[in-house]
């Protein structure tokens, strides 16, 4: 079997794109720090992409009302960068297959908070998809 990497994409606590990430690594910068976007029950340092989901969706042209999970957004951004880096034509049929351990956790926590206060509340559709199941 032959495998060829044609393009790369990354969005992380160090930056958005291979250029920003490489510059941060070369400068010896750390992406680890206190969380700024999410509350946590424990005080631990994290590697956080410091853009909220709305801003991530805007990078992809996704309307705020249709924003998928944070994990899906990050994967789609990196995939779009990789497709662009590989100079794959816009008309080409390209798919993103993503397997994660925390997909949809942000949506699940928001749903649970609303549902717990009133079991008639919460947007079930936002957590019923494969990203959150």
Please provide the spans of the model-predicted regions.
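Conserved "HGTGT" condensation-loop signature of ketosynthase/thiolase-family condensing enzymes
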Residues: 1-133
């Amino acid at each position: 079997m032959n495998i060829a990497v044609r393009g790369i994409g990354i969005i992380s606590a160090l930056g958005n794109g291979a250029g920003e990430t490489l510059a941060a690594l070369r400068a010896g910068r750390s992406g680890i720090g206190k969380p700024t976007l999410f509350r946590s029950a424990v005080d631990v340092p994290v590697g956080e992409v410091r853009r909220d989901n709305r801003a991530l969706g805007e990078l992809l042209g996704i309307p705020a009302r249709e924003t998928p999970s944070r994990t899906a957004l990050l994967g789609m951004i990196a995939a779009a960068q990789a497709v662009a880096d590989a100079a794959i034509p816009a008309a080409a049929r390209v798919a993103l297959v993503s397997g994660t351990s925390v997909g949809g956790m942000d949506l699940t926590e928001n749903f649970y908070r609303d549902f717990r206060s009133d079991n008639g509340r919460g947007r079930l559709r936002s957590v019923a998809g494969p990203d959150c199941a």
